[in-house]
Amino acid sequence: LESYVALFDAAAALTGEPGIALQYGEAVRMQEVSIVGLICEACERTADVGVELNRYAALVVDEDRGEPATLMRGAWQDGNVWIEMPDNALTRDFRMVEAEFARLVWNGRVMFANEPAFRAIRYPGEIHFRHPDPGYRTEYERVFQAPVVFESHWNAMQVDPEFLTLKQPPVNRYVFGILSERADALLKALQATTTTHGRVESALIPVLPRVDVGTDDAAA
């Protein structure tokens, strides 16, 4: 993630556009950069997207822990439905936060551009950021087309409850299964290199045919 942020810094300096992270999130769909995005695109309902996103969070956020992170979660506050980005590696730099919220918003707008039920609601209704105004509020307003609140107590966006009932454009369920199977394999491989148990197993696998030793023996 440090390299990701450094790229935003370099791009902003070279282009003279401080809001380039917002523009990146607006223009580049998650399915263009990650298998997790393809899985989310293949979900049947919008309500399923958060489940799959958090399931494969370790493939999106490199926290070097091999543990699942919560990238997005639903919340109910003051009678409204919100999608919150809780504290995780993505929230350590405000450019990551603005890029991912811009991506989330525009993924929805592009996906449901021809859906009457989506066009009938406001998406998002409002959006909150914990960081202060970085100096380009008008770009935030252009990208999100909704009221923007800085220095809030959370990073979150308000959505119409109807949004969570929308069915996504149909995708072959076989494709969804293949993508999930591949992502599970990638997740397992990642965990094998980031957890203590996985590192021990990886070290022992080359000698297992020659030496009768198991992970329990190694731990002892």
Segments predicted by a language model, with ranges:
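N-terminal low-complexity or simple alpha-helical regulatory segments
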Residues: 1-80, 84
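DNA-contacting interfaces and partner/effector-binding or oligomerization modules
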Residues: 69-164
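Short hinge/gating elements
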Residues: 34-40, 86-90, 165, 186-187
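Short amphipathic alpha-helical segments
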Residues: 3, 45, 49, 92, ...
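Extended mid-to-C-terminal alpha-helical interaction segments
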Residues: 134-220
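Active-site phosphate-binding and catalytic loops of NTP-dependent enzymes
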Residues: 59-67, 113-118, 190
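Short amphipathic C-terminal alpha-helix that caps PH/PH-like domains
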Residues: 53, 97-104, 176-183
